[in-house]
Each structure stands twice: as C-alpha cells, then as structure tokens.
From Swiss-Prot:
NCBIfam families: leud, LEUD_arch. This is 3-isopropylmalate dehydratase small subunit 1. Catalyzes the isomerization between 2-isopropylmalate and 3-isopropylmalate, via the formation of 2-isopropylmaleate. It comes from Pyrococcus abyssi (strain GE5 / Orsay). The gene is leuD1. CDD domains: IPMI_Swivel.
Length: 164
C-alpha cells in the first residue's frame, strides 16, 4: 500500500483539542468533523490541503483527551497518513482502529518541510521525499495491522473476518 501527497508540518504536542476543537464534538459525522480539522492551529489547512496530503509532526502527536473524533476528522479530511516522531498511545490505537495509517519516523520528521512531496510505502516502511530526493525509514506495520488499515478500520476488518 502506497500513498503520495504534500507535507503539512507541525510541532510537538499537538493535542486532540487542537486536532478537532471540543466545540465541534456535538457530532460524530466524519464529514462535519473534517471541516474543522486543525482549524485552531492552522486556519488555512482545510482550505489548502488536497486529498492525499500528509501531516508531519513532532513528538507526542495526538496527546490529550482520548477521543476517536481526532483521527476520524483527519481521515475524513482526506489526509492519507500522519508521520510523527512519536504518538500518544491512545491516539495511535484510535488511528489504527479507524484505519488511519500512522508512522513513527523521527529522522524523516527532522528533514521534511511543509510543501515537500512525499511517497510512503507502508509495507516496507519507506518514506520518499520526492522534493529533496531523500529516503527515510520507519518500521513497517505488522501484517495484521496492515490488514486492519486496508479494511478501513477494525470494525470493517472484523466484519470481513466474520463473513469468512
């Protein structure tokens, strides 16, 4: 599985209240949540990002409240994956559960800049910076996690397994 998109780079400790502000938590409609993703951090993100773009961030991405709305809003906005130095554990689990690919790649984060064109191969863990001509490595997903992501999340994966 590969994705390609432009990088949007942010710093450390981007918490779930910044990813999707609490004032929008009166809905769980992914399309509605997507309209407001990262709006307090970067008011232009939603209007300028294109489907397939990639969020790149520092340490502890997704810290704070353990709400599934945060990765859901990111995925519904059309972001193809998130690359960070590290993730809050509950965000990591919620992202996998809803089928949002995420990779921990500190070296990549140090080198990638906003606007760089990236290509990510999840099966190998390879991140290509097409703008700079550089290649970075992340640990690839284990097969069972890749299956969950390809299925669109844990619920869809479980439905497929139950059908046989």
């Amino acid at each position: 599985m590969r994705v390609r998109g432009r990088a949007w780079k942010y710093g450390d400790n981007i918490d779930t209240d910044v990813i999707i502000p609490a004032r929008y938590l009166n809905t769980s409609d992914p399309k509605e949540l997507a309209k407001h993703v990262l709006e307090d951090l970067d008011p232009e993100f939603r209007s300028k990002m294109k489907p397939g773009d990639i969020i790149v961030a520092g340490e502890n991405f997704g810290c704070g409240s353990s709400r599934e709305h945060a990765p859901l809003a990111i995925k519904a906005a059309g972001v193809s994956c998130v690359i960070a130095k590290s993730f809050a554990r509950i965000f990591y689990r919620n992202a996998i559960n809803i089928g949002l690919p995420i990779l921990e790649a500190p070296q990549a984060v140090d080198r990638i800049e906003t606007g760089d064109e990236l290509e990510v191969d999840f099966s190998s863990g390879e991140i290509r910076n097409l703008t700079k001509g550089e290649v970075y490595r992340a640990n690839p997903f284990p097969d069972f996690i890749m299956e969950i992501i390809k299925a669109g999340g844990l619920v869809e994966w479980a439905k497929r397994r139950l059908k046989g």
